[in-house]
């Protein structure tokens, strides 16, 4: 096996190739439409990392995507397709808002309670899907899609209910300030505090002008924990065994049904806490009437596939995805190209990630071909040696 084929077999190679193909296809589309691809990609990169404020907004946008991406990746490793991440996220936002409005505890209690309730709401929605799968064999895609719509209409019901509706708006009441997880909330509420924040080198202006919060820290910890849980614990081993082959896992004594329910509960909990953190960490700290989904859960599917369903790999994948979404606005503003070009890039990346097995297959083909050529070369050398020996024998006679 050569160095090239070793590199080709690594999962990260498939991801890099998919990303390159995504930008290659976008280049062709932009050039065909009469736009300068270099200028467009320059605007995209500048919109992602051109200012500290842009970087902060990319991180903020990546936070829920990291949670939902890890949730989908985790379920996929156990052989389940959690397309209900969107609904579990919405349930998390709704119940976090309900508790955040009704309770006004000290921050040291309010924040954990609000996040815990959001997490439990998502976990309950996920566990229900897992239980229906384990008990009755109902496919998780069907039940989770139905729960997505239930979550949307439940969200609208809560917003429009008398207890939570904000007058003359399509929003709910905001949660109490004791539940906020934004950084330096008190300083942002005064002009002197804002001035002091902006004096902080490098990050001060970004913190002052964005909803920077603790969410990304929690999300990274969650991604690392889920990766550790899957690869380093008995529970994770059993879940992966269920994902590889349920019949074989059942035969070895693993409780398949319990693991299916537990997996979906954990996956839903990740989505629920993502929703809760968006309520506690982002203005206006409330939920709104939804005419359509916000796509945090559905975009999490793309993040998971770009990461090759690796929980830790979802960290850079979510940042890339969020950067494309946020920086894509600059492409439209600076170059005038439609923002749909970003969707083309993302779609192409996901498409080629789905074909990620092709590159390892190509590496295997190259190894077989090289081995065959080496064998033929050895055979040729052996035949030449035999011919030479025969010729020498005849000369001796």
PLM segments and residue spans:
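Membrane-interfacial amphipathic/re-entrant helices at transmembrane-helix boundaries
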Residues: 1-69, 108-109
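Short loop segments and helix-boundary regions at transmembrane helix junctions
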Residues: 2-13, 76-84, 106-108, 112, ...
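Transmembrane alpha-helical segments in multi-pass inner-membrane proteins
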Residues: 265-347
């Amino acid at each position: 096996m050569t160095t090239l084929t070793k590199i080709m077999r690594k999962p990260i190679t498939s991801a890099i190739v998919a990303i390159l193909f995504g930008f290659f296809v976008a280049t062709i589309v932009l050039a065909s439409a009469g736009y300068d691809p270099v200028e467009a990609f320059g605007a995209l990169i500048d919109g992602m990392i051109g200012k500290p404020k842009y970087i902060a907004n990319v991180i903020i946008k990546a936070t829920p995507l990291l949670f939902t991406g890890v949730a989908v990746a985790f379920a996929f490793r156990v052989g389940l397709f959690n397309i209900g991440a969107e609904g579990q996220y919405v349930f998390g936002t709704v119940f976090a808002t309900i508790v955040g409005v009704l309770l006004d505890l000290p921050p040291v209690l309010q924040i954990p309670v609000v996040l815990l309730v959001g997490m439990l709401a998502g976990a309950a929605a996920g566990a229900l899907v897992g239980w229906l799968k384990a008990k009755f064999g109902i496919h998780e895609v069907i039940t989770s899609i139905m729960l997505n719509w239930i979550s949307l209409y439940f969200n609208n019901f809560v917003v429009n209910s008398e207890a939570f509706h904000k007058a003359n708006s399509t929003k709910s009441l905001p949660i109490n300030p004791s539940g906020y997880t934004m950084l330096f909330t008190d300083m942002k509420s005064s002009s002197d505090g804002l001035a002091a924040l902006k004096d902080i080198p490098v990050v001060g202006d970004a913190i002052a002008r964005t909803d920077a919060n603790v969410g990304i820290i929690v999300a990274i910890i969650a991604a690392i924990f889920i990766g550790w849980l899957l690869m380093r614990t008995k529970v994770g081993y059993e879940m992966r065994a269920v994902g590889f082959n349920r019949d074989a896992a059942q035969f070895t004594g693993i409780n398949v049904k319990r693991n299916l329910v537990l997996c979906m509960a954990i996956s839903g909990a990740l989505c629920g806490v993502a929703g809760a953190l968006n309520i506690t960490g982002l203005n206006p700290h409330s939920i709104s009437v939804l005419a359509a989904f916000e796509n945090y859960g559905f975009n999490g599917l793309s993040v998971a596939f770009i990461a090759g369903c690796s929980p830790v790999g979802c960290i850079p994948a979510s940042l890339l995805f969020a950067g494309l979404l946020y920086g894509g606005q600059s492409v439209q503003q600076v170059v005038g190209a439609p923002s749909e070009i970003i969707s083309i890039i993302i779609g192409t990346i996901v498409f080629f990630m789905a074909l990620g097995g092709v590159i390892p297959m190509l590496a295997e083909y190259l190894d077989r071909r090289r081995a065959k050529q080496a064998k033929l070369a050895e055979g040729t050398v052996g035949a030449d040696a035999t011919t030479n020996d025969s010729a020498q024998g005849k000369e001796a006679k």
